[in-house]
Regions:
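Extended recognition/assembly regions associated with phosphoester-bond processing machinery
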Residues: 1-227
């Protein structure tokens, strides 16, 4: 099966178009947010697994569905929704979500927010065996190993030049047993940062043997104009 959700740069309506038809082929797409998501049940050798698909949420979206709830922040909004879809503690559960979890490392590629207003508390996800997160470009865990951003497969700005992209593989064993591994995703053309004088950087010896088809961000240290 394939599971997909809409993120903060997506149109939830467009992503969800044809979702009912796709579900017949085991391609599950998050619908437009209309309330807490129902689990998608699967079964493997260890028993049932519930998959929850939660698209990117803003407080206004949740207030519209639950007008009687006191929702002032992103954490309030997410908490309101997750309380209504709390997983069965006797069953294994996976949540796919797209939020900025407090404590995660961001970079310039992500959409900035003032004062971290869009941060949510990692503790909100505690009931799930694994939380597959999107939104941040750097692969990383947040707090526990099973609360993880897979990161983007490619680098989208030079602020990501030193990131090591990877694919995350998750294996669910019996309840409480989760095994994680990663595989590197080396780019065909990397992003690299160079710093030095014009003469240093144009000397053939400085780039001999390097990948000359990479994308470069160059900082010249010359104190005089280069003719």
């Amino acid at each position: 099966p394939v599971f997909a959700i809409s993120g903060n740069h997506d149109s939830a309506e467009r992503v969800a178009f044809g979702a009912h038809l796709l579900a017949g082929s085991q391609v599950y797409v998050s619908p437009v947010f209309e309330g807490a998501p129902a689990p998608i049940p699967l079964t493997d050798a260890y028993g049932p697994v519930d998959i929850y698909l939660l698209p990117f949420l803003k407080p206004a979206m949740v207030r519209h569905i639950y007008p009687d709830e006191p929702i002032e922040s992103y954490s309030d909004a997410l908490g309101c929704v997750l309380r209504r879809c709390a997983p069965d503690p006797a069953r294994r559960s996976v949540l796919v979500a797209h939020q900025f979890v407090a404590g995660a490392a961001a970079c310039e590629s992500e959409e900035p927010s003032v004062g971290g207003l869009d941060c949510v508390d990692a503790a909100l996800f505690d009931g799930f065996d694994y939380v597959a997160l999107g939104h941040l470009h750097s692969p990383q865990k947040v707090g526990r190993d099973t609360l993880r951003y897979c990161g983007t497969p490619l680098k989208y700005s030079f602020s990501e030049a030193h990131q090591h992209k990877s694919a995350t593989f998750v294996e669910l064993g019996p309840k409480g047993e989760v095994t994680l591994s990663t595989a590197p995703l080396p780019p065909k053309h990397d992003l690299r940062e160079l710093r030095g004088s014009y003469m240093e950087l144009t000397d053939r010896r400085s780039y001999a043997g390097t990948a000359t088809d990479d994308y470069l961000h160059i900082t010249l240290t010359d104190e005089q104009d280069v003719p």
